[in-house]
From Swiss-Prot:
Reactions catalysed: malonyl-[ACP] + acetyl-CoA + H(+) = 3-oxobutanoyl-[ACP] + CO2 + CoA
Source species, domain of life: Bacteria
Gene name linked to the record: fabH
Protein name, UniProt field: Beta-ketoacyl-[acyl-carrier-protein] synthase III
Annotated keywords: Acyltransferase, Cytoplasm, Fatty acid biosynthesis, Fatty acid metabolism, Lipid biosynthesis, Lipid metabolism, Multifunctional enzyme, Transferase
Free-text domain note: The last Arg residue of the ACP-binding site is essential for the weak association between ACP/AcpP and FabH.
Length: 318
């Protein structure tokens, strides 16, 4: 028995922050941002709009696409680095907003690899018979943990959510998943704040060593894709679509080049929403499904890399 994706959905907040807007906020330019990242705009959550609110809209779209009802879902996994609160989980909050009270609901935190981790986890539940219909969501409000005076990071990130519905099926859907982590890199990309006696200790904002992140990301994204292909006796030429984490265009194109995958087989949406962390892969997937690029029986590699470092891949037959 397999798990199969039967519906996708996404949501981006209404407010758009362009590169031109950022020119008036920090010492940067539209040309500098586009040349180095490929990003043209990013979406920013409204005041009071939480990760669960973004997740709710993406989930509704995925549920509609799957032609099921919320009550049919018996597992919710939300990947987020920016939860609504310390606890309860954003997944539990989302479950309530969907009008549900059945089945487990929990969060996964693997930063930009979060959706890959969550999808792999849901696949294990569904393919083993522990769940029938799973809702898997990546949702982020990175604007809340951004230092808007730091031009090295504030130009990169945006808010958004993407979701998929997994169901049990005899026909192959998710073929394999591959997850990894190396905590020795934990200080390279981090938001290191912690709470002690009600007070925040350390900076709550994102800090990163950009050069180290770039080199590591390209290396492990190539390895993760090859691992998935080798596990299924496939070659890079057998990939119909590569959907990597939408960090920046240089990482995306460098990964594809190392794999020998032509640009026309790569789904890249980073220009329209920036790095949305755990939301980026399902956002890109949903766009490619809705615009008709993804067709039945195609092979798709979904992959991500994030702080930790964490990384992984999922190979899908659509």
């Amino acid at each position: 028995m397999y798990s199969r994706i039967i519906g996708t959905g996404s949501y981006l907040p209404e407010k758009v922050l362009t590169n031109q807007d950022l020119e008036s906020m920090v010492d940067t330019s539209d040309e500098w941002i586009r040349t180095r990242t490929g990003i043209e705009r990013r979406h920013i959550a409204a005041e009071g709009q939480m990760a669960s609110d973004l997740a709710l809209e993406a989930s509704r779209n995925a549920i509609e696409a799957a032609d099921i009802q919320a009550k049919d879902i018996d597992l919710i996994i939300v990947a987020t680095t920016t939860p609504d609160m310390i606890f309860p989980s954003t997944a539990c909050i989302l479950q309530n907003k969907l009008g549900m009270s059945n089945g487990p609901a929990f969060d996964v935190q693997a930063v930009c690899s979060g959706f890959i981790y969550a999808l792999a986890t849901a696949d294990m539940f569904v393919s083993s018979g522990k769940a029938r219909n799973a809702l898997v969501v990546g949702a982020e409000v990175y604007s809340r943990i951004m230092d808007w005076n730091d031009r090295s990071t504030c130009v990169l990130f945006g808010d958004g959510a993407g979701a998929v519905i997994l169901t049990r099926d005899q026909k192959p859907g998710i073929l394999s998943s591959h997850l990894h982590a190396d905590g020795s890199y934990s200080q390279v990309l981090t938001a290191p704040a912690s709470i002690h006696s009600g007070k925040i200790q350390g900076t709550p904002f994102i800090t990163m060593e950009g050069g180290t992140v770039f080199k590591f990301a390209v290396k492990v994204l190539e390895e993760a894709a090859l691992e998935a292909l080798q596990a299924n006796q496939l070659q890079p030429s057998d990939i119909d679509w590569l959907i990597p984490h939408q960090a920046n265009i240089r990482i995306i194109t460098s990964t594809a080049k190392k794999l020998g995958i032509p640009e026309e087989k790569v789904v890249a949406t980073v220009s329209q929403h920036g790095n949305t962390s755990a939301a980026s892969v399902p956002l890109a997937l949903d766009q490619a499904v809705r615009d008709g690029r993804i067709q039945p029986d195609q092979h798709i590699v979904l992959e991500g890399v994030g702080g930790g470092f964490t990384w992984g891949s999922v190979l899908v037959r659509w």
